[in-house]
A protein has these predicted regions:
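Bacterial Sec-dependent N-terminal signal peptides
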Residues: 1-29
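A short, amphipathic beta-strand motif
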Residues: 347-357
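Secondary-structure boundary elements
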Residues: 28-37, 49-234, 269-270
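Structured interaction patches on ligand/partner-binding surfaces of diverse proteins
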Residues: 409-438
Length: 449
């Protein structure tokens, strides 16, 4: 009996011993970082106070990737949010007037605000991360609509303390659940939707859609409203705004959700985003149109696009190497994963580059752009590739799209190929610039998202 008790105690102590040993080695790694106090406090909490190994690993995941996430520096953003709050509370203003006023104040006082950013590791507190880890971990452990997730899925679909850069570090899980989660208190008990991921997700989506009184205005409206107080109150947002509300509201309710996007949007217009849930079957079900359509109802069966990226918390290693080595760094973002082949048929392409053009280039990185409906800037960069053995090489490109390859000549990006169509059979057909601008070529025939 004594030996049995001793063995039991040893088994009980194993998680504690594991966390303590990890904490000791991890803290030594951060010793030289001047901002290590909050990190050490977080690791200490999950090694001594709450020694659950998976929580410790979740904390490590957050810390290891935090350098890829940014917030506004300084307090000027709060002046902007205060102004936005006063606009949204003014019932005498129409959504158009609210939007136009916000655009005016952005251009006159806050247009340079996104340039002044700071890494989250210099701002975030251990208490805030503990709040997010504990909240999401409890949902993963107890909610029937989240229990299908593996631990690795949990790290990306539920855990992150933010969904996009510049999102306010506030208690959005509690705030948005209070706005859109009342249905969880009185669920409809039936034999079909009850406690399913899709059933709960559509309940949250429907409540958000009906309570926000959204008035879709798809023109520029100033800096995005990224605080949990303002997000549910905006009436003039665009599709990405409401897709963000969707993914945050779902995560607040314990529904596994992520945010996907394309750099070139509807019919070669602006970029767009949508949210995705992971169902009980492990299927990834898309929202198609922000909050206004049912989840999983089909995803644009007639469309195709150049690229689709998933907003992740983990830093994309390909993008990280690019940001370190490129002589010209395009602002792709460090935490975006290429998932184009989950939506479309794709091709890896190799484009021969003339020797005389190669001599003018100052970097091994090259770029691929897709056509957009903008006379001033008719091409939008969608990805980067590399120049190897005299060829510009690009991977995982969407088919039946009009492209052009570009390179860095020391001053900026310049075309290094003629425009070309990547056909369904992966055949590359070059077309002249005159043909691209000719009415004879219906370049919008192959609509993107």
């Amino acid at each position: 009996m004594k030996n049995h008790n001793t063995s039991y105690r040893l088994l009980w102590c194993l998680p504690f011993i594991f966390c303590i040993s990890c904490w000791d080695s991890d803290c030594k790694f951060w010793d030289n970082d001047p901002y290590c106090c909050e990190i050490k406090e977080l690791l200490y909490h999950y090694s001594v106070v709450d020694p659950i190994p998976q929580k410790y690993q979740a904390a490590k995941f957050i810390i290891d990737n935090i350098k890829g996430h940014y917030s506004y520096a300084g307090n000027q953003i709060y002046d902007y949010y205060d102004f936005a709050a006063s606009l949204l509370s003014d019932s005498l203003l129409s959504p158009e007037q609210q939007r136009d006023s916000l655009l005016f104040i952005t251009d006159s006082r806050f247009k340079d605000l996104p340039k002044d950013r700071i890494s989250d590791k210099y701002l975030i507190s251990a208490d805030y991360l503990i709040y997010n880890i504990d909240k999401s971990f409890e949902q993963w452990s107890t909610c029937p609509w989240a229990s299908q997730l593996s631990f690795q899925d949990y790290l990306e679909w539920l855990l992150p303390y933010k969904a996009v850069d510049y999102q306010e570090l506030d208690c959005w899980r509690d705030t948005l659940l209070a706005h859109f989660g009342s249905g969880l208190d009185n669920p409809v008990v039936n034999d079909v939707e009850y406690n399913t991921t899709l059933g709960v997700a559509d309940m949250i989506r429907s409540q958000a859609y009906s309570s926000m009184h959204r008035y879709g205005l798809y023109t520029r409206s100033g800096l995005p409203l990224l605080s949990s107080y303002l997000l549910p109150r905006q009436t003039f947002g665009n599709i990405p705004d409401y897709a963000l509300v969707g993914v945050l509201a779902l995560r607040a309710a314990g529904v596994p959700a992520v945010l996907d996007e394309t750099p070139v949007g509807a019919r070669y217009t602006a970029a767009t985003k949508w949210f995705v849930i992971k169902s009980d079957r492990g299927e990834e079900l898309t929202s198609e149109w922000d909050l206004s359509t049912m989840i999983g109802g089909g995803f644009f069966p007639y469309e195709r696009g150049p690229k689709v990226f998933r907003n992740t918390y983990a830093i994309d290693q390909r993008g990280l190497q690019y940001s370190k080595k490129a002589k010209y760094v395009y602002p792709f973002g460090l935490c975006k994963k290429d998932i184009t082949d989950r939506y479309f048929l794709t091709c890896n392409i190799e484009l021969p580059i003339d020797r005389s053009i190669r001599k003018t280039l100052k970097d091994k990185y090259v770029y691929i752009a897709s056509a957009v409906r903008n006379d001033a800037e008719p091409w939008c960069i969608v990805d980067f590739g590399t120049l190897r053995h005299g060829k510009a090489i690009f991977d995982n490109m969407g088919r039946e799209v009009l492209y052009v390859a570009m390179g860095y000549d020391g001053n900026g990006l310049v075309p290094i190929t003629a425009p070309f169509i990547l056909h369904k059979d992966c055949r590359v057909e070059y077309v002249s610039p005159d043909t691209v601008n000719s009415p004879a070529l219906d370049k919008w025939k192959n609509n993107t998202l």
